[in-house]
């Protein structure tokens, strides 16, 4: 059976949690393959209960699904334990959550360095969440990181943390004038936290590949979005990992030939959190409308998201770099009651029309959107469950976005609830 990748096709916050939740009842495994608690998924159950998840895969809310925090994720132990407790206090069974032995641990010195660095950068800062994600990935690449499996051996763990803090404390004290961290305290705190998750540590690569060989279906859930990818995003205003489809194989240990479908999540308009270029950003009453009606505030940071019209240039780019086979278009209901809905179909850069993603960031910063005006609709579409239930103008909008983005819009979100979705093509049944 297949492995299916679910990725954000914009700058994150597209509604990936809703998509995972919709598919979750028909897959056996849900895997988070990159990122950390710098991203959030919101899932609204049919009961009206609202769950905000940061580290734990959205499949935890679906009974019978085994959830995996993959080797590509950076795990803050305190956040993990708090999130588990929050779920368990609300009656959610978390017994089927596993953590890759090779995932990296995010520790207090990562957070400290992240925060002081952003403060030091001032107006030149990237706009990170300040949760230590970047510094943790830096340690991973520098080969001085702490892996989840290290908590199983006190001696190894102590040696690694002492070695890491020799450098980190020099940075904190001599560059940023902060207090040094005590390696003994860091070790003891981590070992105490590990008591709450050591039973979840597993060789998840082996388990996932064995599951695929046994005919089970694996859903690989990315966090953030394509334009935040460290290689393919709007660098340097990006995250420190690869949310794109290629990162799914690396961050889970599943071979790329196992992946049979890539589901891109697209919001019916565009949002972004933090600094960086955003050609269709709105600063008028339309931006206010999208922000207020769409509830555009970050799940993790609480920061207000920047809002703009749908950008077909970045949608096409996402289709290309991810090999997207299907789209899930979310928040179509937010656009109801607009007289017209502009869609960016290209850019004008220094007087010349550009239809594809600019090669340089300086060009993207200068890009002016070229809009195609589509007629809006006034009807409430939140109760639509079939494509034909939508007003004709809403259907036309979806079909035009499908044409511009270059892949089939297989699902459409018309509200925050699990059941508020239209399925035009069954993602799982359509796969070989």
Swiss-Prot record:
Top EC class of this enzyme: ligase
Annotated binding of GTP, by residue: 12-18, 40-42, 305, 331-333, 413-415
Molecular functions per Gene Ontology: adenylosuccinate synthase activity; GTP binding; magnesium ion binding
Primary subcellular site in the record, as a coarse category: cytoplasm
Gene Ontology annotations of biological process type: 'de novo' AMP biosynthetic process; IMP metabolic process
Keyword set includes Metal-binding: yes
Catalytic site: 13, 41
Residues that coordinate or bind IMP: 13-16, 38-41, 129, 143, 224, 239, 303
Keyword terms of this UniProt record: Cytoplasm, GTP-binding, Ligase, Magnesium, Metal-binding, Nucleotide-binding, Purine biosynthesis
GO cellular component, one term: cytoplasm
Biological pathway: Purine metabolism; AMP biosynthesis via de novo pathway; AMP from IMP: step 1/2
Cofactor: how and how many bound: Binds 1 Mg(2+) ion per subunit.
Subcellular location: Cytoplasm
Subunit organization: Homodimer.
Stated family: Belongs to the adenylosuccinate synthetase family.
Name listed for the protein in its UniProt record: Adenylosuccinate synthetase
Species per Swiss-Prot/TrEMBL record: Mycolicibacterium paratuberculosis (strain ATCC BAA-968 / K-10)
């Amino acid at each position: 059976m297949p492995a299916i990748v679910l990725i954000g096709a914009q700058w994150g916050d597209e509604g990936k949690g809703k998509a995972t939740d919709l598919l979750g009842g028909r897959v056996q495994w849900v895997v988070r393959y990159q990122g950390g608690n710098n991203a959030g998924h919101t899932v609204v159950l049919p009961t009206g209960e609202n769950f905000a998840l940061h580290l734990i895969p959205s499949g935890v809310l679906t009974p019978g699904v085994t959830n995996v925090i993959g080797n590509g994720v950076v795990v803050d132990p305190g956040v993990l334990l708090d999130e588990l407790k929050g779920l368990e206090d609300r009656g959610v069974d978390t017994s089927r959550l596993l953590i890759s032995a090779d995932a990296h641990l995010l520790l207090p010195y990562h957070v400290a360095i992240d925060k002081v660095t952003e403060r030091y950068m001032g107006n030149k800062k990237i706009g990170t969440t300040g949760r230590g994600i970047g510094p943790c990935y830096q340690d991973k690449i520098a080969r001085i990181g702490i892996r989840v499996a290290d908590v199983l051996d006190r001696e190894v763990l102590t040696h690694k943390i002492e070695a890491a803090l020799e450098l980190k404390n020099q940075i904190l004290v001599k560059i940023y004038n902060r207090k040094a961290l005590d390696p003994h305290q860091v070790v003891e705190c981590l070992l105490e936290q590990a008591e709450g998750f050591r039973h979840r540590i597993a060789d998840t690569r082996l388990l996932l590949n064995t599951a695929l060989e046994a005919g089970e279906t694996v859903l690989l859930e990315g966090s953030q979005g394509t334009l935040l990818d460290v290689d393919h995003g709007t660098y340097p205003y990006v995250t420190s990992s690869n949310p794109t489809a290629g990162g799914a194989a690396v961050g889970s240990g599943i071979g790329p030939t196992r992946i049979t479908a890539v589901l891109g999540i697209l919001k019916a308009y565009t949002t972004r959190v933090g600094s960086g270029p955003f050609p269709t950003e709105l600063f008028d009453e339309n931006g206010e409308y999208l922000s207020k009606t769409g509830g555009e505030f970050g799940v993790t940071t609480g920061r207000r998201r920047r809002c703009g019209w749908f950008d077909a240039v970045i949608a096409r780019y996402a289709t290309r770099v991810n090999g997207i086979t299907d789209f899930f278009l979310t928040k179509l209901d937010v656009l109801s009651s607009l007289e017209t809905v502009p869609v960016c179909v290209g850019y004008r850069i220094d007087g010349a029309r550009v239809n594809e993603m600019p090669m340089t960031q300086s060009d993207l910063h200068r890009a002016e959107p070229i809009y195609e005006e589509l007629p809006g609709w006034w009807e409430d579409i939140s109760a639509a469950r079939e494509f034909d239930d939508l007003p004709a103008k809403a259907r036309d909008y979806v079909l035009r976005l499908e044409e511009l983005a270059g892949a089939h819009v297989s699902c459409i979100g018309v509200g925050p609830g699990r059941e508020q979705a239209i399925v035009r093509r069954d993602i799982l049944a359509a796969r070989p």
